[in-house]
Amino acid sequence: MQVTPDAASFHGGIVTALDVSPAGVLLNTTVSASPVLEFRDFSLRCDKSDPEAAFDNAWNWKLPPGKRIAVITTNSFLRYQLIVGLAGLVPPVSGEFVGEGVIGWPVGGEGGLDSKLRVSHALDFLSAVYGDCLEHSCVSLDEILKLLLEANIHPDLIIKGLSKSQKDFFFLSLSTLFAFDLYLIPKTKYLMSRAAKPLKSLLLKQIEGRGLIATSTNSRFLREFCTDGLVLGRAGEILFSGEISESMQWASANLESFEVSDSEQDQFEGQLNFSNSESSNDVDDF
């Protein structure tokens, strides 16, 4: 277990300090592999009622390949900001993040597709855009097509005309098809449902050895999908890091009003302004 100071780097599954910790211990390590993601003086909005409120201490840390991180915080607005920020939907307040490889759109999201497209056209479009990710995928297009047909989602159907459950299945199947270098998982209600079980097993296979950042508080999801946890304060400060079970236990003992359950957590409020300025448009779709 380790309580961390401001500047940190993921190494061996633990956020390790690059500077003297509050306890006066110098923990200076290096990351051997090229990071899949690096934060440089990175800061986001962290209070939906105050557009000027950002991280108390900017992030400077690296995420190496293969680390699957659960970001644990009681600040639901910060969880949302982190996902849409990494997805490129809102800019940071300061700094930047850079990475080696492809960051996928939030898992289960619409991937920027026009709802008037047919299922087949959507698959063709994304396969063309993410051709390299499809080439390196351990899930075949035929596997996905078979599952879609079993869910009565036929290639000639228009996305807009699908039922809600069909849309959930379709969009999760798209996220499962491609081998991204970094996956973003904000919500897990459908992913952890019985209806999504065949896709869940494929996604678990797909993310093996790849990076993941998740903001769900579903305990079953965290234990199945994440290797490590990063506990944040309400202003984005890194409070603790470690193996996922340790991180969950630490958060339960030290974060006021924190709890995890087997049910879905936040339902993001689409009518709120989740951008980094008062004048920006609302972002409510992935």
Predicted feature locations:
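Conserved beta-strand-loop-alpha-helix hinge in the C-terminal portion
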Residues: 235-273
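Glycine-centered positions in the ABC transporter ATPase nucleotide-binding domain
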Residues: 42, 95, 235-236
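Conserved H-loop
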Residues: 217-225
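A short, flexible loop at the N-terminus of ABC-type nucleotide-binding domains that lies
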Residues: 5-62, 66, 70
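ABC-family P-loop ATPase nucleotide-binding domains
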Residues: 45-47, 102-197, 201-205
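ABC ATPase nucleotide-binding domain signature region
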Residues: 62-130
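Asp-centered catalytic/switch region of ABC-type ATPase nucleotide-binding domains
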Residues: 225-227, 233
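Conserved catalytic loops of ABC-family nucleotide-binding domains
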Residues: 202-218
